């Protein structure tokens, strides 16, 4: 229960799903946590849950596509807790789904702006704060979709998340000499509210579960434990990794 004692973390997309469970897990391991998402009332409930469990958290609502918001999150971490050690850039959007030739420019840009530009803006301001600390851990959420398995109808989502992997690897090469590790998690199907768009019928749910060697989807808590590994000193020699936490979807062919 003390893997992150004395550390301060930012978690975006924290109002639900993987981000919510990661924020609670980080706090339970001793971190001070800045929780970020668009819905203040959801963040307030998360902070209350963390504090009930004896942890420390502060909420700041906003949009990760807003550069001023990205800067404000880091400023809050430094002014309140004295610095920034960990950032989990997890906020995401499906974007418009369907045949690529039917996808609107607006639907395409939504996925790119949230998933890729949001990750870039977060990192842009998190990096100097970690440099001031003498090191840190940057973590991004990507996906197996388009990386190991192509899925029809997911062009905007897959392309934006593939871009996150490129960003992660570039940053890992740039920042390794400064003691900043940069990695990404690639979850398989996970039972979150965002993922319900993929499994809105029993038939779709059965199909998605069947893609996995384990024949089920992950819980958000299972993915959060992998994020904790990358955030902690347990992964002190890991950087530039696209870490599959996918229940075997990338190797299953039945």
Locations of regions flagged by a protein language model:
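Conserved glycine-rich cofactor-binding loop
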Residues: 8, 15-17
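The beta1-alpha1 cofactor-binding region of Rossmann-like NAD(H)/NADP(H)-dependent oxidoreductases
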Residues: 41, 61-73, 105, 221
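Short C-terminal tail/terminal secondary-structure segment
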Residues: 94-97, 227-228, 239-254
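Substrate-binding pocket helix/loop in short-chain dehydrogenase/reductase
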Residues: 98-100, 107-112, 208
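Active-site helix of classical SDR
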Residues: 123, 160, 168
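Alpha-helical segment proximal to the catalytic Tyr-Lys
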Residues: 128, 147, 173-174, 236
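Short, small/polar-rich loop/turn modules that mediate ligand/substrate recognition or access, typified
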Residues: 176, 181, 238-240
